[in-house]
């Protein structure tokens, strides 16, 4: 006989934890099932940089940033590019989410003990016009404690609810089907997997030791996206971005396999915008990998010169940190699936950060002493220097001819011509003498340094790339890094899932990445960053509160 509860949550990542704790706090019983072990509680969010999109925050105001709901919504709509009938609910979610980010989001988190690093980052800067893609102002608020710091309040609440008997975890329970009675989703069934104490993030076994069935008045799908499943990524790769990359690295663990998306779709849920994905172009292969094909994203400042595989500088405004999707489209149009940064030691010292909690021990460990060393150390942060020394994608040389020769050797071809690259670097270097120039990237550097946060810790003083005083020269081979699924199950503002016939499926909810972070694609085609964790928080909260009101 199936065990019964009020609500079942499929997935113990951030959105699932948020939904489950809201349900438990409302006095309802909830069971959280996940195919991974307890050590993976928090899912992808644990590995994140902990960035949150906030609007008109105290942190922004202290840095002299003037922001507003109206400006943020203008940026969001210009970035999303909503252009389909399917975008009706994503647009509603976008307006509601920006209001959340400009309203109670920060205070809600702060009441649970969440804290923010005081310097606000400026991600996805765009470079088009006021109504186009990008953040007009810095909005990327890093959680003090990075990914674990955003998971902790909800894990704590979940464990407290578990102690009181309102919440039950069922780890190593893999859902294989949703049960439906008279058109209402009322449970799940699947396989019990053998215990596996593998380290968090590493691939766990799929050995089946039993089966299970659970019944409830509502089921919330919080199972994540497809970023760990390269086959699915390639299947969904849009024609507008050219052929899918032959070589990709993974920004998420292997268990982010998209399996539950197929199971939920089979039950009649409407999946929309499946061709919209968010994959990074600044991926580097992890020299100390945790999961298969483990990649890390460089979070670059504005100064590195960016070249495609043939040695041609990327066109304006495709500079570091400007337009991820535009960069991906351009790179794939070259016929190659990689590109290059060329920079100096002075640039890497101040401008290279690595995404991920494990790559930022100072912020993750909440150590002010270690964090302050970023501004005072002679070298780059220790994890960056480790990649420079051990990473297969990094090349360090004193002379440009030696650097280019090594780049060709690493790529296994002869595409790069020294004179072509030297001409472009020297032309850029001539623009450095004045603070007013025509080179759009150099203008971008000067603009960045007008913001105190960038000037302090994220943007190097303008200098010539070929100036030996700022050497050695560094080249980084950049790979395509899989990450987020932007499409998902179509949901209303209560996270209730629509069926293929256009009506809500009773008893079924979807949250987080499985719901395109809200509505089936709250981001449209592009993200402003800091919005994925936020989408998990907002959609999970909405679903948990709505489901708690619905169940008896």
Task: Locate predicted features.
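Conserved redox-cofactor binding core of oxidoreductases
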Residues: 94-212, 230-233, 284, 425-469
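A glycine-rich dinucleotide-binding beta-alpha-beta segment and adjacent secondary-structure elements
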Residues: 413-518, 522, 526
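Glycine-rich loop(s) and the adjacent beta-strand/alpha-helix scaffold that form part
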Residues: 196-287, 529, 533-542
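An anion/pyrophosphate-binding glycine-rich loop and adjacent beta-alpha core
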Residues: 261-263, 267-409, 413-416, 420
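Beta1/beta-strand and adjacent pyrophosphate-binding region of the FAD-binding site
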Residues: 2-15
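Glycine-rich FAD pyrophosphate-binding loop
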Residues: 25-46
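Rossmann-like flavin
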Residues: 65-133, 399-427
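N-terminal glycine-rich dinucleotide-binding loop that anchors FAD/FMN and/or NAD(P) in oxidoreductases
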Residues: 46-76
């Amino acid at each position: 006989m199936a065990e019964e509860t009020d609500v079942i949550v499929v997935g113990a990542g951030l959105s699932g934890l948020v939904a489950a704790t809201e349900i438990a706090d409302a006095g309802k019983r909830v069971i959280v099932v996940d195919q991974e072990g307890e050590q993976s509680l928090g899912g992808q969010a644990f590995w994140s940089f902990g960035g949150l999109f906030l609007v008109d925050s105290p942190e922004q105001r202290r840095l002299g940033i003037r922001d507003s709901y109206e400006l943020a919504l203008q940026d969001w709509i210009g970035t999303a590019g909503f252009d389909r009938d399917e975008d009706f609910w994503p647009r509603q979610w976008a307006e509601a989410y920006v209001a959340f980010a400009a309203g109670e989001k920060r205070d809600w988190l702060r009441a649970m003990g969440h804290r923010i690093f005081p310097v606000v980052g400026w991600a996805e800067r765009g470079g088009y016009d006021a109504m186009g893609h990008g953040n007009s102002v810095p909005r990327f608020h890093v959680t003090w404690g990075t990914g674990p710091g955003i998971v902790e309040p909800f894990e704590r609440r979940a464990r407290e609810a578990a102690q009181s008997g309102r919440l039950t975890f069922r780890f190593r329970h893999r859902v294989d089907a949703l049960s439906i009675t008279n058109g209402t989703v009322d449970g799940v069934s699947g396989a019990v997997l053998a215990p596996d104490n593998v380290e968090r993030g590493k691939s766990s076994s799929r050995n089946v030791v039993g089966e299970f069935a659970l019944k409830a008045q509502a089921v919330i799908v919080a199972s994540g996206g497809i970023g760990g499943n390269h086959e699915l990524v390639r299947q969904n790769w849009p024609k507008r971005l050219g052929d899918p990359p032959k070589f990709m690295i993974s920004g998420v663990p292997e268990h982010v396999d998209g399996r539950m998306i197929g199971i939920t779709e089979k039950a009649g849920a409407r999946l929309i915008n499946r061709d919209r994905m968010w994959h990074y172009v600044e991926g580097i292969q992890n020299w100390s990998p945790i999961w298969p094909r483990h990649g890390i994203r460089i979070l670059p400042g504005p100064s590195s010169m960016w070249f495609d595989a043939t040695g041609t500088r990327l066109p304006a405004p495709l500079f570091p940190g400007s337009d991820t999707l535009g960069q991906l489209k351009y790179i794939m149009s070259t016929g190659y699936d990689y590109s290059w940064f060329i920079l100096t030691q002075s640039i890497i010292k101040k401008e290279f950060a690595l995404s991920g909690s494990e790559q930022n021990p100072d912020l993750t460990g909440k150590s002010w002493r270690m964090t302050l060393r970023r501004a005072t150390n002679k070298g780059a942060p220790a994890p960056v220097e480790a990649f420079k020394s051990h990473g297969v994608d990094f090349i360090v040389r004193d002379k440009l001819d030696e650097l280019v020769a090594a780049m060709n050797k690493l790529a296994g071809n002869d595409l790069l011509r020294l004179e072509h690259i030297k001409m472009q670097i020297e032309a850029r270097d001539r623009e450095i003498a004045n603070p007013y120039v025509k080179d759009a990237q150099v203008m971008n550097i000067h603009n960045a340094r007008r913001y105190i946060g960038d000037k302090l810790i994220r943007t190097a003083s303008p200098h010539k790339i070929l100036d030996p005083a700022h050497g050695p020269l560094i080249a980084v081979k950049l790979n395509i890094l899989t990450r987020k699924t932007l499409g998902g199950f179509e949901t209303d503002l209560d996270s209730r899932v629509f069926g293929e016939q256009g009506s809500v499926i009773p008893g079924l909810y979807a949250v987080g990445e499985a719901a395109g972070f809200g509505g089936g694609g709250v981001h449209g085609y592009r993200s402003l960053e800091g919005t994925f964790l936020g989408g998990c928080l907002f959609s999970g909260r909405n679903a948990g509160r709505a489901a708690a009101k619905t169940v008896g």
